[in-house]
From Swiss-Prot:
Factor IX is a vitamin K-dependent plasma protein that participates in the intrinsic pathway of blood coagulation by converting factor X to its active form in the presence of Ca(2+) ions, phospholipids, and factor VIIIa. It holds the Pfam family Gla. Ca(2+) 8 binds at E286, N288, E291, E293, E296. GO terms for molecular function: calcium ion binding; endopeptidase activity; serine-type endopeptidase activity. It comes from Felis catus. It catalyses: Selective cleavage of Arg-|-Ile bond in factor X to form factor Xa. Glycans are attached at T85, S99, T206, N221, T223, T230. Mg(2+) 2 binds at E72, E76. GO terms for biological process: blood coagulation; proteolysis; zymogen activation. Ca(2+) 4 binds at E61, E66. The gene is F9. This is Coagulation factor IX.
Amino acid sequence: MRCLNMIMAEPPGLITICLLGYLLGADCTVFLDHEDATKVLSRPKRYNSGKLEEFVQGNLERECMEEKCSFEEAREVFENTEKTTEFWKQYVDGDQCESNPCLNGGICKDDINSYECWCQTGFEGKNCELDVTCNIKNGRCKQFCKLDADNKVVCSCTTGYQLAEDQKSCEPAVPFPCGRVSVPHISTTHTRAETLFLNMDYENSTTDYENSAEAEKNVDNVTQPLNDLTRIVGGKTAKPGQFPWQVLLKGKIDAFCGGSIINEKWVVTAAHCINPDVEITVVAGEHNTEETEHTEQKRNVIRTILHHSYNASVNKYSHDIALLELDEPLTLNSYVTPICVADREYTNTFLKFGYGYVSGWGKVFNKGRPATILQYLKVPLVDRATCLRSTKFTIYNNMFCAGFHEGGKDSCQGDSGGPHVTEVEGINFLTGIISWGEECAMKGKYGIYTKVSRYVNWIKEKTKLT
């Protein structure tokens, strides 16, 4: 301050001398000591709020907080690509997981302009919103699905198959497992199980017709259809071995019905086909009834079991199912193979897939002559309401309709007792038995089938089928 007073009072020459002294650190005290200077230059450290705080270290504040940095600059701070990437996802566009978008216990992982949910077992989807237990997509199992004690999906297979390495698919465990077409020249895959399961409402599919109010009809309300042995008009000619579970039932003179191989000793057919006075011969491996093809196997029936609820005097087509025991076991091969029988729930589910295959040597057109070569037809399932409206006859809840409204295609006389099968991932399951109908292939009329799902427990009990 003394120097400043001198500058104001003295002439210019003295001012020059005073300024020189100032620059040389003379008596003018204008510089602060070290401690005071440090206080002036210091500033409070920034606080980094939010999830980014855990990433801030080293020179990150200078590199990326005070000004926008590049990924490479951030990498220099972390010296670790994984940590840098995790920081970068939040740094660029904020935390996408802040709103907790993942459902059902899913864990959210932030990404640039997006996020990823790591779902708990049994759930999937963008936000883990989809239940992938057995109720949806069948747990991705190709055949059967159930939940274990921890509510985790466990897949399983029908008899003669085992789980493949993926624990979802099924592969043969025996040379000639049920429901499998093994003749090399025949393509077997008409449908894919995954597609079918994906397109189904599985929970609703297990609801049987018996829950329908329209199905509650008294079994004593007896009305008989027009055709006694009704049940392939407009079908295609099968190749040898294409339906190896199909059998032909013959009396002493003529063939009269069809059937399906359950195992080496048992065949299932329609109860109305059985006449106690007629000895039945079962022909397996048959294709052309007018030629010997050396694939045929003939067996005599030694015991017939009609379903205990079947009563032809009350109604000839209610509980229309019977089992035939053979005198000797069939020899299984590519032309003689049993059909698969699932449990009640899955048999009903497979039926609801919508399409099935029927086969037989019945009449190839209404009032025509029987076929000599095995015929087959793909038929759509008809909803129950439409089925009931199509006929004046009683349709019980142990029956279902299949066929075409426009007519021209149907099972027909002589096909009775034959199989209605549904293919699931190349494996065929019995879902119906050809039973009856009004004429054959008439417009607005459908084929009526015995619903096998109602009888699978009985079939397995009587035939010892596991």
